[in-house]
């Protein structure tokens, strides 16, 4: 699944998961991406986008 925000372009972050014995394994942190129906203009068509919750909280998307 491609966890990329259509508004800001935020994608997954990569790093290591470190256990108690300090064994390191690769992992990724995906942004919280939600499917949103967005109104392109008043009275216009709705468009389905994948948007991160930080963009929704910032008001960059008008849901409809």
UniProtKB/Swiss-Prot annotation:
Among its keywords, does the record have Phosphoprotein?
Answer: no
> Out of the domains of life, which is the source?
Bacteria
Q: Which GO terms describe its cellular component?
A: ribonucleoprotein complex; ribosome
Q: Name one GO biological process term.
A: translation
- Family classification: Belongs to the bacterial ribosomal protein bL28 family.
Q: Which NCBIfam families match?
A: L28
**Full protein name:** Large ribosomal subunit protein bL28
Lineage, opening ranks: Bacteria, Bacillati, Actinomycetota, Actinomycetes, Mycobacteriales
